[in-house]
Amino acid sequence: MIKNLVLLALLFSTSYILMSQEECEIKLSHTAGFYDSPFYLKINCDDCDLQFAYSYDDEFSNLTDSIYIDTTVSIVLRHKVNDEVYDLDVHSFFVGFETKFKVISLNVSEDFLYDKVLGLYVPGHRAYYDTTVSHYRNANWSYKHERLNHVEIFNEDGDRIIQQNSGLRIFGGMTRYYPEKSFRIIARDKYGLNRFNAAIFGSDTVAYKHLILRHSGNDYRSLRFKDALITSLASESGLDVQQSSPSHLFVNSEYWGVYNIREKINKHYFANNYDIPLEGLDILQGYQVLDCGEKTSYLNLLSYVKKHDLSVEEHYEYVTTLMDTRNFINFWVHQTFYANPDVRGNIRYWRSDSLDGKFRWIVYDTDLGFSSTFMNDNMIKLFSSSSSTRWFNPTWSSFLLRNLLKNEGFKNDLILQYSIIGNTILSKESLLNRIDAFKTLYEDEMLFHFENRRKFQRNQGSVEKWNKHIDKLIVFAEKRPSITERNLVETFNLSGKYTLVLNVENPQHGSVSLNKNPISRSNFSGYFFTSVDLPIVIQPDIGYCNVGYSHSIINPSDSLLVNDTLSVLVSFKHLGSSPEKAVINEISFEDPIIELFNQDTTLINLQDWSFYISYTDSSCFLNVLDSALIQPSSYYTFPTENENYTAISCVKLYDNNNLLVDSVSFDISASVSDSAYSYSRTIPFDSIDGELPYWEISYTPTLAAQSVHYTDLLFKQHLEMEAERRKSLIIKSTLIAISFLLVILFTRRLFRSKT
């Protein structure tokens, strides 16, 4: 994979340099991106004189010929008008560099990095070394200094998705004092654009105010991905995390190594991920440190918990209106499982008036977790202790958890969640698979990292050491699940463990949840405790029923256990089709309305019928609540509250017994440009004179009436019948005329014979 790398960073004014109110167009022979071999770069400008240098800080020379690119180089282009230097832009080229990662190129004045006064990366002229804490005080990097830089980001396909000026800051807490540091880049109006407009993390979000270029924090000399791995697991429990994307970082054409692009947890994070306004948003961290909004609601929560005994159900129920207790439980399940001692200083929590006003917790900065240091510790007990027993569990950090555990329902919920998450997301098999996936993703890139970076590389590892750290992750994944299981027993004095074996037949036709956790597998196996009831909800899809286990609680304290194992079978069976003879006849996209037609000769009552509407990424049910009658051979229209039918893939109609009456599937989003149309059956019956119905797009909706096609068909039939009638009349008239003539001829012949 690894070839000779050449990086060219070109800086010039936004592809057009303004000169005396006229545009001066600059043309490059090569576009920014990745190339297999060295090349000559040609730069043309018909109306301006360009100068170039090999960095921001070098002396500029006139550009008279093409430039041969065969090494790592930055070329800065500029144009002067009346001694004014116009805004600079950057185009980066990578030669012989193959990667599965994104690539970031930062270009910044060396003074902004290393100058004693201006430099972000040096202690600075005011700093002094404090031997009591073993780091510099008043260092430049400890302040929120921000410097201008230019950033480019290339995606995994080699396409440039970001190219703009931005602000540059040092990012992190204690990691600021490390020789290698993380960066934050900020989009602001004063730099040009106030957002980084790209799908950085492959999600629907395409506009970011801040991006973190993180060296992996406390893990920066080990794996370079531990926090990204841990938060990828935590996100599967619905917890808020920073999305992550691995990258290679170049600064002024110098390779700095593997960094992770991360979201920043601030007000813009919630605007992006929850589409909520900033008004009414509160964000706090650590011990009541306010990041955004107000802390009044959180102080009220703490005050109530302090003054009330939460073992009293009424008091606990009130607390559930102030905080999302399931979210809080999942947060602590993950944090204690990872044995993360640094959770106290990195607690992040938030609420919004625009949602339900409840506080929720964020999994953040977990680099010290998932290690052998605290692998054998009972973190559940430590983080629910009423006294500070270690440096990482001051009483304020355990206050909420230890008080909530006084409530029996909360305690049982935490035990169940530990079992369910421990049997799924945090099972040994799941953890080993995730570690292997990250190893596969990173191993070739880390080889390049160790072999090609010169800055910071001394005493910072090798591929061999990196693989040893992978082995440590594997040991943790193999041992920690059984340790936390013992921790649960020890902390809550549990007994009577059993193994639940859950098998689901036809899982695509229903859902099963344990303690409100959807079980997506057809085969589930995991440990639980007989002293804690396990809620199970079995929900067949409309048109199906469950013919297996039918209880709402699993408690195998009786003779159901066989060798400490309880086997539960859930089987979803199709109920069959409805005898009702109604059909979906037309779907109007403008109104929107679904039209039904009664093919039967008797009345149909639609009360308690339902529509199932499947979208490209979701689904919903619409119920007919009131009594609605359809006369024989008549139509009924059902309004559907502005459903987006262009995103729909299927509509199904069920009767009051959940039996399927009719369905239609379609994909019309690519074939229409507006909503002034409908999708309809050509005829409302299963066949007419041998013609079968089909569905078509119609630009003349005919709700509660015959379709144009059906009307045309009936008119055609009428014409054909009229033609047949006329033909029959003509034949009949002809036969009568012929018969009359024959009678006349016969009469004349008879008369002549007599005379």
Please tell me what each predicted stretch does.
Residues 102-104, 111-128, 133, 138-141, ...:
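Middle-to-C-terminal accessory/interaction subdomains
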Residues 106, 127-293:
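Conserved ATP-binding subdomain of kinase catalytic cores across diverse folds
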Residues 4-13:
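Sec-dependent N-terminal signal peptides
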Residues 21-30, 86-91, 472-475, 484, ...:
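Intrinsically disordered, low-complexity linkers and terminal tails enriched in Ser/Thr/Pro/Gly
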Residues 66, 71, 131, 205, ...:
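Coil residues (strongly favoring Ser/Thr
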Residues 19-140, 148, 155, 162-164, ...:
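Short, compositionally stereotyped local motifs that mark structural "simplifiers"
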Residues 1-4, 752-754:
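Positively charged n-region of N-terminal signal peptides that target proteins for export
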